[in-house]
């Protein structure tokens, strides 16, 4: 590795397992989550499983608050004081949270806190949620630490982010009803009939791709949709995500191995930011599809 000091930073929506964050030296800053009049800092005040149980018991809708400008300024200043020369900061989709824009402003305000600082901030909008950007940040950190050029690793990461897709299934519509994403009537009828939506989440935009009846039909429908998005699933990198049900997780992993011909890169648990909208009962497949958008490569700040 070169003598240039590099640090890696992201937010808790990335859902990076703590063991991977520790392994690759990635700092993960928690989102603020409000539920039943109380504020919790994700990754510090509760575990994912505790949050899921709180959602089930609550009649209110959990809300999330963006990481603020002042929080980012304080964090950036600590990196400057530590002698960091390049800070790689990968953020939650800018279209779904003000966290990215707050970080942009913080990079400007940093000059007031640390006049004349020389740290380059590589601030990147992931255009997605959860481990799709968490995984690629881990890969970027791993390669940089192994001595690969930072600029090349950053370009590769952004290229892959333009290909990554999420296929999500919710086993209950209760949380979507609470959050207003579906009407109360539709949620009641849907749950009574056992309707399970298969949802794509690409570039921050969610879309119902299919509706199936019954839990047993969920994994096959997800796999079918994923197959429609790629040319060769045998060469497709993918991950499996879950909320609280290990049984549904294991069922999906088993089917993916059979249909895709290889095991997932990682099986991970979804955190509070995503599940605050989808509910505590869901599974997902994260995979590399075809390029969907041109990449506007980030320019270091300031």
Region annotations inferred by a language model:
Residues 6-73:
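N-terminal glycine-rich anion-binding loop in soluble enzyme alpha/beta folds
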Residues 7, 73, 77, 117-119:
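Generic alpha-helical hydrophobic packing signal
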Residues 69-103, 107-110:
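N-terminal glycine-rich phosphate/adenylate-binding segment common to multiple enzyme folds
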Residues 2-7, 13-27, 32, 95-108, ...:
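Mixed-charge interfacial surface used for oligomerization/domain docking
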Residues 57, 84-89, 113-124, 267:
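Glycine/charged-rich beta-loop-alpha catalytic/anionic-binding loops adjacent to active sites
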Residues 57-72, 84, 135-153:
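Short N-terminal secondary-structure initiator segments
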């Amino acid at each position: 590795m070169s003598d240039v000091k590099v640090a890696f930073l992201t937010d808790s929506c990335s859902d990076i397992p703590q063991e991977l964050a520790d392994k690759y030296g990635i700092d993960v800053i928690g989102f603020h989550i409000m539920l039943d009049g109380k504020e919790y800092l994700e990754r510090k005040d509760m575990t994912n499983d505790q949050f899921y149980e709180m959602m089930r018991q609550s009649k209110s809708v959990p809300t999330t608050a963006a990481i603020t400008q002042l929080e980012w300024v304080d964090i950036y200043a600590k990196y400057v004081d530590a002698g960091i020369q390049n800070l790689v900061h990968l953020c939650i989709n800018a279209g779904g949270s003000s966290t990215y824009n707050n970080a942009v402003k913080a990079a400007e305000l940093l000059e007031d806190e640390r006049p004349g600082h020389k740290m380059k901030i590589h601030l990147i909008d992931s255009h997605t949620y959860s481990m799709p950007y968490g995984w690629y940040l881990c890969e970027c950190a791993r390669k940089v630490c192994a001595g690969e050029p930072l600029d090349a690793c950053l370009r590769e990461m952004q290229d892959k982010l333009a290909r990554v897709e999420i296929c999500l299934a919710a086993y209950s519509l209760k949380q979507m009803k609470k959050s207003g994403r579906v009407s109360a009537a539709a949620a009641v009828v849907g749950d009574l009939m056992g309707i399970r939506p298969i949802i794509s989440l690409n570039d921050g935009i969610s879309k119902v791709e299919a509706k199936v009846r019954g839990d047993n039909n969920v994994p096959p429908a997800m796999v079918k949709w994923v197959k429609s998005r790629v040319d060769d699933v045998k060469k497709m990198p993918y991950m499996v995500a879950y909320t609280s049900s290990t049984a549904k997780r294991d069922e999906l992993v088993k089917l993916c191995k059979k249909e895709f011909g290889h095991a997932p890169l990682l099986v991970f648990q979804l955190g509070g930011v995503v599940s605050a909208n989808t509910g505590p009962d869901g599974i997902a497949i994260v995979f590399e599809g075809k390029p969907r958008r041109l990449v506007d490569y980030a320019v270091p700040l300031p």
